[in-house]
Amino acid sequence: SLILRAAQRRGLQLADSTLLSYRAEAHGFLAFLAQLGEGVIIPPKVVQTEELALSIAWWQPNRSAQQLVGRRDTTLLPADVGYYRDRYGVILDNLPDRIRLGDGQDVRDVPHPLAPSAMGLYEYQRAEPVRMRIPGREIIVDEVRFRPLNGATPAAIGSVFLDRETAAVVRLSMTFTRAAILDKRIETLVVTLENGLVRERYWLPRRQEVEVSRASPIFDIPVRGIVRGRWEVSNYEVNERIAAVTQALPRWSSVSSDSLKRYQFPGRVIDVLPPEIQIATSEDV
C-alpha cells in the first residue's frame, strides 16, 4: 500500500537518496495572542510577536545544523511571554517516529502515523487524489487520512498527502488525542508541514505552522492564550559542500544577541503577521 511505501521510505530515503546536502534560509514568526471571553464575541489579539531568521544546513548521513541569525520582537501589551526552544527551529524530517513537541511538554513519544512500528496502531483512508503539473511532468498526490484504532491512546489524528510515484510526504497536518496531550490546559494543538519540490526531485520543507491554544480561567472569566508560529523556507542550495565550521555546529544554535539585533529585516515586525490576525492596542488594556 501507499502508506507502507511511505513508512519504508522514511527509513531508506536519507541513506539511498541522491540528495547529499542542502542549505536554505527560513523566515518566520512566533506570536502570542490573548483572548478574554468567548471567541465569537471577542477575537484573540496579538500581545507579543517575534520575527525570526534562521540558516539551515543538512548533509549525509542525516546530520543538520540550524542557527538563529536574526530576531526582533515587539510587546504590544504588558506580558511575560516565553516560548519552548523547539518553536525556534524548522522540522526537517516530517517529524520523527516518536513525536515530541513543546520540548516534550506538550506531547511526547507519540507514534508517528508513518512510523513502521505504528502500522497496527492507526487506520487509514485514502481520499481523492490531487494532480499537480510542472513542465514536462504530472505529479499525482494522494491524501490519506489517519486516526488511531483506539482513541483513548496517545496518538495523532489528521491527514498526509503523498507523492504517488515516490511515496514522499508533500503535506502533513495533525492534531492529537486528549491522551497524547500532556499539558491539560491545552485545548487545541495543530501542526502543519508543507514541502515543496526542489530541483523537480526533492520534497523539502517549504512552509510550517503550529498553533497551540491554552485555557487559563481567571476568576471564572474565560482567558485563552494562543501561540502561533510560521516558517517559510527558501533559497535552497542543493548538493553543495557544507563548510567544516557549519558541520561543527550543534543541531540548533544562535548567534550572539548583538548579532541577532543587527540582522536587517525589511519593514516592521508586525508586517510578517497574517492579515487576519488582530493587533492589540492600548485600548485593550
Predicted features, each with a name:
Residues G158-V160, R164, V190-E200:
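Extended lipid/amphipathic-ligand handling interfaces
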Residues S1-I157, R178-L182, V212-V285:
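Structured extracytoplasmic
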Residues T177-K184, T188-E194:
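Outer-membrane beta-barrel proteins
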Residues T166-R171, T175:
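Surface-exposed extracellular loop regions of Gram-negative outer-membrane beta-barrel proteins
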Residues L172, R206-Q208:
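Beta-strand-dense domains in secreted/periplasmic systems and polymorphic toxin scaffolds
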